[in-house]
Swiss-Prot record:
One of its GO terms (biological process) is translation. One of its GO terms (molecular function) is ATP binding. It catalyses: L-glutamyl-tRNA(Gln) + L-glutamine + ATP + H2O = L-glutaminyl-tRNA(Gln) + L-glutamate + ADP + phosphate + H(+); L-aspartyl-tRNA(Asn) + L-glutamine + ATP + H2O = L-asparaginyl-tRNA(Asn) + L-glutamate + ADP + phosphate + 2 H(+). The keyword Ligase applies. Belongs to the GatB/GatE family. GatB subfamily. Allows the formation of correctly charged Asn-tRNA(Asn) or Gln-tRNA(Gln) through the transamidation of misacylated Asp-tRNA(Asn) or Glu-tRNA(Gln) in organisms which lack either or both of asparaginyl-tRNA or glutaminyl-tRNA synthetases. The reaction takes place in the presence of glutamine and ATP through an activated phospho-Asp-tRNA(Asn) or phospho-Glu-tRNA(Gln). It comes from Bacillus subtilis (strain 168). InterPro entries: Asn/Gln-tRNA_amidoTrfase_suB/E, Asn/Gln-tRNA_Trfase_suB/E_cat, Asn/Gln_amidotransferase, Asn/Gln_tRNA_amidoTrase-B-like, GatB, GatB_C_1, GatB_Yqey_C_2, Gln-tRNA_amidoTrfase_suB_CS. The gene is gatB. Heterotrimer of A, B and C subunits. Keywords: ATP-binding, Ligase, Nucleotide-binding, Protein biosynthesis. This is Aspartyl/glutamyl-tRNA(Asn/Gln) amidotransferase subunit B.
Amino acid sequence: MNFETVIGLEVHVELKTKSKIFSSSPTPFGAEANTQTSVIDLGYPGVLPVLNKEAVEFAMKAAMALNCEIATDTKFDRKNYFYPDNPKAYQISQFDKPIGENGWIEIEVGGKTKRIGITRLHLEEDAGKLTHTGDGYSLVDFNRQGTPLVEIVSEPDIRTPEEAYAYLEKLKSIIQYTGVSDCKMEEGSLRCDANISLRPIGQEEFGTKTELKNLNSFAFVQKGLEHEEKRQEQVLLSGFFIQQETRRYDEATKKTILMRVKEGSDDYRYFPEPDLVELYIDDEWKERVKASIPELPDERRKRYIEELGFAAYDAMVLTLTKEMADFFEETVQKGAEAKQASNWLMGEVSAYLNAEQKELADVALTPEGLAGMIKLIEKGTISSKIAKKVFKELIEKGGDAEKIVKEKGLVQISDEGVLLKLVTEALDNNPQSIEDFKNGKDRAIGFLVGQIMKASKGQANPPMVNKILLEEIKKR
């Protein structure tokens, strides 16, 4: 029997507001534990929440960027549950009137475009953070308690773990472009739970789902779903049934591990939040927020293809993060040729960032520095090989490309007299290579060029070396 995989994702995104959703407590990351909280966040008797307008507008902006319909009438509800990181014993969330519904984004997998529906986007407060010490104790930090969140729930339109990864990449990109969140999984500002089930191909009814939690990266989401897909298939083919469970992905064993069995859906006993009035969002407010949305990744990618003549793949890579796209545009504004700037960012820059596990903001390279180096290559002041030495200096220490070239004596040798001397020495020392070339072995030229570049410490002008070399061989 063949099965179809059905996946739905729930993504929590912390909003980058200056203060919390219902109090004036600040929201910096990494502050000393329990220093960024208040009696409102902790739910002391007699205190009342006040809704943060910026949080509402950030949620609206995110929902609009995800093609959601924005509610005119929306409200907040109490979600009741007990847990150590939830001091009020309830969370203020949205139940039946979310701020955004019926959205979608488009992903590309295997060269094919697919639309993934978004059921809803709702606004809520985050919980505190538990740290388990390993000696029987758990420590709780309430700094995060009350930080504004949006929960984005996808339709069960995702059919493969690869599609799930692509969906998360696209979702993160769009949210980052809006500026409402930095979406850093390592800091907890983007978190994801995945629901997965299998059903026989052709069957419309969904199978029993399992929920995957503690997914610390997009790669873990994909790996966890891949394992769970195989596990469920083996269970079903063995004649057993899938239990409704919550599981976690363990990277060490590369398996999903049972956390708890769920006998039914959770009953949070939602009821309208009595301390907050319903919220009315009129058309004027919607239009004002819509006008504040910047150019989104798909729009920027289309512009790069149409105006700069970039291949679709290059445009996609450059626009995946706003940080990279902005860096590219600033580099071009500083005088670099667009294609060269693109090549360096997709090549050497991305390779360095991946190897060091860093982002552009973490390195010393600036658009001015990269543009200056590219212009030196275009002018023939340095070769592409020398440029890699300059690039290493720029990305690790920063500075001005021209100044680095002069201080380190890296200017490309283009003086014909100097090059002729280098060519003559190479030919005198390698008579066999001359004979090999004359006998039709073109590789001999490559060897001779290599000897000349070695002698010049990589600074000889390659096109000029080739020209002089061929001329001198003819004379012998």
